[in-house]
Amino acid sequence: MSSNLIPQVTLREAVLEDWEAIRVIEQANFSTEAAGAETLQKWIEQGQTNFLIAELNEKIAGYLVGAAVFSRHLTKEMIDNSSKWQQDSDFMTIQRLSIHPEFKGQGLGTLLLAACKEIAVARNQKGLQLVCSDELISYYEMNAFINEGISERADSHAILYELVWENPFLRRENED
């Protein structure tokens, strides 16, 4: 059996040269609310944002954008003041998890979520949080997120749900 038949998955930080491939994936999955080129470039350039790329056989297959926030639940004010997000905050919000349609169902989203969880654990953050539509709830629950109900975010016309993954390795203040 040839080794080139085994898929090679690589996770890495995004670089500016990736933005065109990212834009294609963004358009495929978020056509009505896709981020523009300037936003994608800003996300890549921002030091306080984790922008992870999943490559399958050296082709960009998906990405995850996460930013550190101070609250378990994302508010409109936090979105509007994203320049104030800091690395040493309590939670990381997942702004985008997007896989190219050609590569969906191969576990790349789960790998990106696992990498994001590792970052949160390394930073001693309390966890990850995100909002999603009802059809994605079971996917995130499969990845150990807890559905905390309908989001009170006012930046979307759709009904969105708040989901949280709590860091199981975080030492609680009242524990010995």
PLM regions and their residue ranges:
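C-terminal "cap" of GNAT-fold acetyltransferases
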Residues: 15, 126, 133-134, 153-176
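Conserved acyl-donor/pantetheine-binding loop and adjacent beta-alpha core of acyl/acetyltransferases
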Residues: 64-98, 104, 154-159
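Conserved GNAT acetyl-CoA-binding A-motif
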Residues: 113, 119-132
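Active-site rim helix/loop that mediates acceptor-substrate recognition in acyltransferases
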Residues: 30-60, 65-84
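Conserved catalytic-core motifs of GNAT/GCN5-like acyltransferases
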Residues: 69-71, 131, 141, 146-162
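A short beta-loop-alpha structural element at the N-terminal edge
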Residues: 8-22
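Glycine-rich phosphate/pyrophosphate-binding loop shared by adenosine-nucleotide-utilizing enzymes
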Residues: 9, 59-63, 92
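Conserved acetyl-CoA-binding loop-helix of GNAT-fold acetyltransferases
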Residues: 99, 105-118
